[in-house]
């Protein structure tokens, strides 16, 4: 099925004899290799991240899915709406508008999971949101596209990549399930696997980012408006996702997680859908946007992680220079606060800053009598 973006824009079926542009030709030749390698790498990465998931916490998110519900609202409520508002604000052409809207309707990608781990987010919630959004995409993608294109002149429906969604689910659920099992049976070994996976994920992201910059060299001057949208779109998603999580009284850890999940989209699924729906001649007009969005969401993620690490180190240094009396006073203030968290970074230092007992303690839990009471005895 093909999409006719306007009454004057025809979308005939793709043919193998059609001449591809250089950028798309290189991408098409490496598409199969990239798909297989990325599937294996993502599978191994999700296995290592699954080693950080605890069964009890995961069941808690499923039994009380408030965080998942907020994340789904951000994913399929805010992101399509943001895409639609950007389309109206920049008065995009029909073909460009469809590309931006499809990106907004796609589920969250696995990139957000490793970024969530690096910012000390809620990994159980992150993996739950990625899995649930991918499953919900089977119905929510067609629904969102239908609702937002009611006023558009579309003669035929867009092609939903159900096969790609199914492959993504398999690459998510099976490795994560094995990781959860390893963490349940061998918790010490799972921590080692998690550290190795985090390093491998970082190297993989650096390679993907570098490859994206090389492929983007032919598209930097293609359309400035699309490049601008590809830069601000994920940033707006991160900001609005964080604000919605904050308004629904989620913890700071969950706010960071939902923010990253909201702005990070499954770029490969978006490109697959565009490839199934348009010809190569039309695809070259919007390929730069898809590639730029994936590149900018990577760069945004690295920037957020770097900012978090710097602020966390600064916070630890500040607390380390405090006098013991100030630390005890701050600890007493924390212990009397009914809130779940007290700082955006949620640096858990109560264990290290907690003052020890002032006197000897009885092994059975009863305090040793001192002062006048001891003399009376």
From Swiss-Prot:
Superkingdom of origin: Eukaryota
Membrane association type: Multi-pass membrane protein
Keywords in alphabetical order: Glycoprotein, Ion transport, Lipid transport, Membrane, Sodium, Sodium transport, Symport, Transmembrane, Transmembrane helix, Transport
Name this protein carries in UniProt: Sodium-dependent organic anion transporter
Extracellular domain ranges by topology: 1-29, 89-97, 155-159, 217-223, 279-285
Chief location category: membrane
Cytoplasmic side: 51-67, 119-133, 181-195, 245-257, 307-377
GO terms assigned for molecular function: bile acid:sodium symporter activity
Function: Transports sulfoconjugated steroid hormones from the extracellular compartment into the cytosol in a sodium-dependent manner without hydrolysis. Steroid sulfate hormones are commonly considered to be biologically inactive metabolites, that may be activated by steroid sulfatases into free steroids. May play an important role by delivering sulfoconjugated steroids to specific target cells in reproductive organs. May play a role transporting the estriol precursor 16alpha-hydroxydehydroepiandrosterone 3-sulfate (16a-OH-DHEAS) at the fetal blood vessel endothelium.
Positions of the UniProt region annotated as Disordered: 319-377
UniProt-listed Pfam families: SBF (PF01758)
Gene label: SLC10A6
Protein family membership: Belongs to the bile acid:sodium symporter (BASS) (TC 2.A.28) family.
Glycosylation sites: 4, 157
Modification comment: Glycosylated.
